[in-house]
C-alpha cells in the first residue's frame, strides 16, 4: 500500500501518536450537501445511486472537497445485504426502508441465500476499488456493515420500527429461529467485509444502530456475541497494514467494558455517554470515537467550538480519540456549520498537542 499522506485516523485507531485529533462524520456524504441532492436527483432513487459506481464515488468524495476530513467512508447502506438476499429493498418518501418480502417464519430464513460479495454485491466492491483509486492515498477509506442484530430488525419488521414487536416476539418465543437468522447474517457480514478489505478499504466500522433497545443479557447474547464472531473472522491486515475495526452500538454506553473485550480497536460512542468516563472505564484497551450531539451543528460558531473544546477536554491528553458525532449528521444541518466543526477539532486539538 502507498503510504497515506494523512494517516491520523488510522494512527489514532491504533492508539499511536498523532499531531491532531482526526475527525470525520457518520453520514458525511449525504442530504445536508446541496451537491449531493443534485446527484441524487440525477440517479433517480437511493438504491440506484448506491449501485451506480461513478455517482456513488462522486458522492463519497463530495464532503472531502468541502472539508479537511481525515477519512472517507463508502457511500452505501447497511441494508445492501438483505437486498442481496432477495428481500426486495425499496424506499418510500418519509417512511424509510421497506422490504417486499420480510422474514416471517423459520422457513423464510432457511431459504435465504448467502450472497457472493463479488457477484450480488459487486457494486459495493467496485465502489471501494474506484474510491481508493480516486483518493490516491490522501486519506484512508472506511468500509462498513450493519451488525447482524440491526440488519435483522429491518428484515423481520419489514422496515423501520420504534418498538420491534415482531423481532422481540421472535427473541422471546422462538430464540432458536432468531439465532438461525443471526448466524446466517454473521457469515454473510464476514464475507462482505473481507471482500471490502480486499477491494481496498483500510478500516472497518460495524454499525449496531439498534443494539441499545436490548436488555443487558440479551445484548450480549443476540448482538455482541455475533459482532465478536465477525471480528474474529475478519482479515485484520492487508497490503502490509493493520485493518482497524470500530464497533458502534447506539445506546450502548452501559456495555463499554464488554464491547472492549471483543477484539475491536475502537468503540463508537453516542452523545449520551461522557467520553472522559468512557476512557476511564476502558483504559488503554481501545480507542474511542465520538461523540458530539449532531444537533449542536444547528448552533452558532461559538457554541459549536465550545462543545468541541468540552469533548476534547473530557477525553484528555494522549492519543486514541477520533472525533465524530454521536450519530449521523442531520439532513437539515447547515453545511457551513460543518466547516466550523471540523476546523475547530483540528485547531483546538493541535493547540492541546502543542501545550501537552
Swiss-Prot record:
Annotated EC: 4.1.1.37
Alphabetized InterPro entries for the sequence: UROD/MetE-like_sf, Uroporphyrinogen_deCO2ase_HemE, Uroporphyrinogen_deCOase
What catalytic activity is recorded? uroporphyrinogen III + 4 H(+) = coproporphyrinogen III + 4 CO2
Alphabetical keyword list: Cytoplasm, Decarboxylase, Lyase, Porphyrin biosynthesis
Pathway(s) this gene product operates in, as recorded in its UniProt entry: Porphyrin-containing compound metabolism; protoporphyrin-IX biosynthesis; coproporphyrinogen-III from 5-aminolevulinate: step 4/4
Any one GO molecular-function label of the UniProt entry: uroporphyrinogen decarboxylase activity
Q: What class of enzyme is it?
A: lyase
Q: Where in the cell is it found?
A: Cytoplasm
Subunit note: Homodimer.
The protein, known as: Uroporphyrinogen decarboxylase
Species the sequence originates in: Hamiltonella defensa subsp. Acyrthosiphon pisum (strain 5AT)
Q: Which gene encodes it?
A: hemE
